[in-house]
A protein has these predicted regions:
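Non-catalytic all-alpha helical scaffold/repeat segments
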Residues: 1-301
Length: 301
């Protein structure tokens, strides 16, 4: 086992005096691999000043600077997860997306019972980000991985709590076709890119379904119902259900017209696989699975 030397008060004072300069600040945290510095630095307030997003040009997105201190926390988590947890819980949230992604990485490196204590801090982030910045910082990708991590560690309630917000779909409007009576079209969008959404559904949700069972399936049903409602009302007024045209078969088939990046189609496949898993592992009988889906009014279900 590796051993570390705790810093003396004089060493801490010397570092505090030196890291007022940006380059030395970065150099110290990039080179420091000693977890025994965590609490002395925290006691001096070093982790209380994360950088805020900076709006350089009002025509573009804010800049979210990398924070060397939070990268240090990520590296130290495996050595002292409790100390890192205490520090992160005391840190102010400035809205800096690089820092938020670092906190997700911290949680991914923690035992599930420790990481679960950060979930209440993370869930509100999903309601704030926009598509452009979110995709760049991959916050949803990290949270998807955290859903799977928590589920594997037995923290299914925390995993479900993230998944409920992570998988939410909504409508976005685009201009209607020229000359059409429909002024705009509505389509289904996720809180992240459709590619990332598909990755979460195929990589992380199956783990959640395996460990959490029916509650995970109900999340998928709810979001698929929302997606179908958006599709059926895409022209501004209710339309017939055409799912038998764009998704005629439940299994992958060339007859299916929807694209792989279509959120509604992704949800159909994810729900199909989730229900199949519960039937295979004996959680649901085939009859119970059929009744679960048939009680919903949407033809696609």
């Amino acid at each position: 086992m590796q051993s570390w030397t705790p810093p003396t008060a004089e060493q801490v004072d010397a570092v505090i005096a030196r890291i007022g300069h940006a380059e030395q600040y970065r150099h110290f945290f990039e080179r420091n691999n000693n977890p025994l510095w965590l609490r002395p630095l925290a006691e001096r307030g070093i982790f209380k000043t994360p950088p805020e997003p900076v709006q350089v040009d009002w025509s573009s997105s804010p800049l979210h600077a990398v924070w060397p201190a939070s990268r240090y926390l990520v590296r130290m988590t495996e050595h002292d997860p409790q100390a890192v947890l205490d520090i992160v819980r005391a840190m102010p949230d400035t809205g800096n997306l690089t820092m938020r992604r670092d906190i997700v990485d911290v949680a991914l490196a923690m035992p599930g019972r420790v990481a679960a204590q950060l979930v209440s801090r993370m869930v509100p982030w999903l309601r704030e980000v926009n598509d452009a910045t979110e995709s760049f910082f991959s916050l949803s990708d990290g949270l998807g991985r955290l859903v799977a991590h928590l589920a594997r560690e037995g923290e299914t309630q925390s995993a479900l709590r993230i998944a409920k917000d992570l998988l939410v779909v909504s409508a976005t409007q685009t201009p209607g076709d020229p000359g059409s009576y429909v002024p705009h079209n509505r389509r289904v969008k996720a809180r992240c890119s459709s590619w990332e959404y598909g990755q979460i559904l195929t990589r992380d949700v199956p783990v959640l379904v395996h460990h959490a069972g029916l509650p995970a399936v109900r999340i998928l049903i709810k979001q698929l119902k929302s997606a179908v409602w958006i599709v059926r009302n895409s022209g501004g007024r209710p339309e017939p259900d055409y799912s038998m045209i764009w998704r005629p078969t439940i299994e992958p088939h060339e007859q299916n017209l929807a694209h792989n990046d279509d959120v509604t189609d992704q949800l159909i496949s994810a729900l199909r696989d989730a229900v199949s898993t519960l039937v295979t592992d004996g959680t649901l009988s085939l009859r119970e699975a059929t009744e679960l889906l048939e009680k919903e009014s949407d033809p696609v279900l």
